Design a protein with these regions (language model features):
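Long, basic N-terminal domains or extensions that often function
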Residues: 144-145
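Active-site pocket-lining/capping segments in soluble small-molecule metabolic enzymes
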Residues: 2-137, 148-243, 250-535, 539-661
Length: 661
């Protein structure tokens, strides 16, 4: 590509902002775009986030400097969230006028139309648009302007997605920041272990904890940060990649500033060895975890989980020495006055923070107060998590003085009420129990059966019964797997298959004659409100199995307003998460245990690793209430249990008795 054409395809750099100081730091670093969240419906509710009032002057200032602002509304919407979310969209449109919103829930597609939102629609990585044909589908069906690609893709897969990208749609690629262990949109770990949903921005990061397997106690699921650093030069040759995204809405202004500056240098001066060296120095100074290229280079993939590396948030600067009464630190990096240190990991109840009072040279001695009475006596890790530099503070302060004063907004007395879809009128139909297997033999062919679609599952199944099977597609389809899966779909279709359960809304693109099909949206579509159901109906779905992490009130309210017949996962083995990675030190099909005594195991299916708890989801005790509410399909997920795993008898109600947070 010529230098001139490279400039014309120059990607924008998208910076995170979880508070005002970080927003202004992104402006100071000359970010092209900034994304931030509100205090509701954001996938990073642990960040401070913004009110509408705070966002108005910040957005005006950004626009005045030619910087675009996108608001993340990428949380799962529950049944009673629709009116509030719609009102929020109206307020954004009237007062903030962001350049676009980032969403995962299909209900927001309908709300954007109903409220007349004029900005762009971006599909979050939580939407799991993960294979090339899906790219074309989301543009055609929803008119989205940008898709955020999964972090797990390698460069060849990214190129395949770009090749399929239609005109008018841009792709966004993560280049730097925290890596979740689970595939985005396919992790229920935090919710299953305590009711705080990652899909609603309240993940407590159970993947960062210490787990025990055999005699090892390690952080088997805690990933390093993704850092493409110098490899981003490869992305410059792909014009469909419009945006380089930096993760970090929970990070402070120091991290935001230096990370943005580093990637601007790598984008604009990536061929200059001295400038590359400066950029890498900035990244090392940005207070992140150790970095990994992960899958980016398919010929040299890196495992993101390295149990001997420190993976606490912040920059590891050493371990506490001395006695419990007289602890001290010899820092691996020089510490400045005002630096904020965290002692211990965030999941350890005894962890604490201290502010450095004066400069400490590299290798010097910082005396610590004996504040950690409940901590272990040895090897307490210390992380530098925030830094207050005068130069950066001055830049932020100067920008803060430029913030325009905004007039007091007189609220419109009208309240937004979401328009509900017409109900399906099929709530009194036949009730079905659907048992879903990995493989089916003759002994299992009683009642209605489902089968996960795979080579092994199809091989030994008599073709004469293929018409009776409910065929389940995987929760994730990677670019390399698309053609193989399409071949399997075509094979069973040619032998009379009619009923399919799709586990991402865009999987309809694998079928040609939708009207002849009985397609159901599966539970991994993460459907929890009637406007999302309305969107599914417009895509040709005949029914939907709702997300199983809801509480009793939400479950029972859905069928009465649904435009589609509804199903529910009544019992079975529901995964904590699905991942593309596995620690080299963790055995599959062998139990591991959390600090609280919860056990689980990992099993590989096709391209992915499924993490299962060692107790089943079981809502059977509430079946009558669910039938009365209008559910007509009751799903039982039956996984093969490894020999080394023993299931526990537990109630298995998940969030039934809780209100999902």
């Amino acid at each position: 590509m010529s230098e001139e054409s490279e400039k014309s395809f120059r990607p924008t750099i998208l910076a995170p902002a979880g508070n005002k100081a970080s927003f202004l730091a992104a402006l100071a670093a000359s970010a092209d775009e900034i994304y931030c969240g509100l205090r509701q419906f954001s996938a990073r509710m642990e960040a401070r986030n913004f009110s509408i009032e705070e966002l108005v002057p910040l957005t005006l200032l950004a626009h005045d400097k030619g910087v675009k602002v996108y608001v993340a509304l990428n949380a799962l919407l529950k049944p009673n969230d629709l009116n509030i979310a719609g009102e929020l969209l109206q307020q954004l449109e009237r007062r903030v006028k962001p350049d676009g919103i980032i969403i995962q829930d299909l209900g927001f597609v309908q709300l954007a139309r109903q409220t007349g939102f004029s900005g762009e629609l971006h599909f979050s990585t939580l939407s799991n648009v993960s294979f090339p044909a899906a790219i074309q589908k989301v543009k055609k069906s929803f008119g989205v302007h940008r898709v955020v690609l999964p972090r797990e893709l390698n460069i060849d897969e990214i190129k395949a997605m770009a090749t399929a990208c239609p005109k008018g749609l841009g792709l966004e690629v993560f280049v730097h920041g925290a890596l979740c262990y689970g595939v985005s949109g396919r992790c229920y770990w935090s919710s299953y272990f305590g009711g705080k949903s990652g899909l609603r921005g309240r993940c407590v990061q159970p993947c960062r904890r210490i787990y025990k397997q055999n005699e090892q106690k390690k952080r088997f699921f805690s990933c390093q940060d993704l850092s493409l650093d110098v490899l981003v030069k490869v992305l410059r040759t792909i014009p469909q990649i419009r945006t380089w995204k930096i993760e970090g809405r929970k990070k402070g202004p120091h991290t935001v500033f230096y990370t943005v500056k580093a990637y601007r240098i790598l984008r604009d001066h990536g061929t200059d060895p001295k400038m590359k060296k400066e950029a890498l120095h900035m990244l090392s100074y940005a207070l992140g975890r150790s970095g990994t290229h992960y899958n980016f280079l398919p010929q040299r993939p890196q495992n993101p989980v390295r149990i001997n590396n420190q993976t606490g948030s912040g920059l590891f600067v050493g371990a506490v020495k001395g006695t419990k009464q007289k602890p001290f630190l010899n820092p691996k990096e020089a510490l400045l006055s005002g630096d904020l240190l965290r002692l211990g990991y965030e999941d350890e109840l005894w962890h604490g923070t201290i502010r450095v009072g004066k400069y400490v040279p590299k290798g010097g001695r910082l005396f610590l107060k004996p504040i950690l009475k409940k901590s272990p006596e040895k090897k307490i890790p210390v992380f530098l998590i925030d830094r207050q530099e005068k130069d950066l503070e001055d830049m932020v302060s100067k920008l803060e003085k430029e913030l325009p004063k905004t007039p007091v907004f007189k609220s419109n007395a009208s309240v937004f009420v979401a328009r509900q879809p017409k109900t399906s009128g099929k709530k009194k139909g036949k009730i079905l129990d659907l048992r879903v297997y990995r493989r089916i033999d003759k002994t299992k062919l009683h009642g209605t059966s489902g089968l996960w679609l795979s080579d092994q599952g199809v091989k030994k199944l008599p073709k004469r019964i293929w018409t009776r099977i409910w065929w389940w597609l995987p929760p994730v389809i990677w670019p390399d797997d698309e053609q193989k899966l399409k071949g399997l779909v075509d094979s069973v279709l040619s032998n009379g298959a009619k009923i399919f359960v799709l586990n991402a809304p865009w999987q309809t693109t694998l079928f040609t004659h939708l009207k002849e099909m009985n397609l159901w949206a599966g539970p991994f579509c993460n459907i929890a409100n009637v406007l999302a159901l309305k969107t599914l109906a417009s895509l040709g779905y005949k029914g939907a199995i709702v997300i199983p992490e809801l509480g009793q009130k939400d479950f029972l309210s859905l069928p009465k307003q649904s435009p589609l017949p509804l199903g529910i996962v009544l019992s079975g083995n529901w995964p904590l998460c699905i991942s593309r990675a596995l620690s080299n030190d963790l055995e599959t099909e062998t139990s591991f245990t959390s600090p609280k005594g919860e056990s689980a195991w990992v099993k590989k299916f096709e391209s992915d690793y499924w993490v299962f708890p060692n107790w089943k989801l079981d809502l059977s005790i509430n079946r009558k209430a669910l039938e009365k509410a209008g559910f007509r399909l009751f799903v039982h997920l039956l996984e093969p249990i490894p020999k080394k795993v023993k299931l526990k008898r537990r109630p298995g109600l998940w969030n039934w008795d809780l209100e999902l947070l």
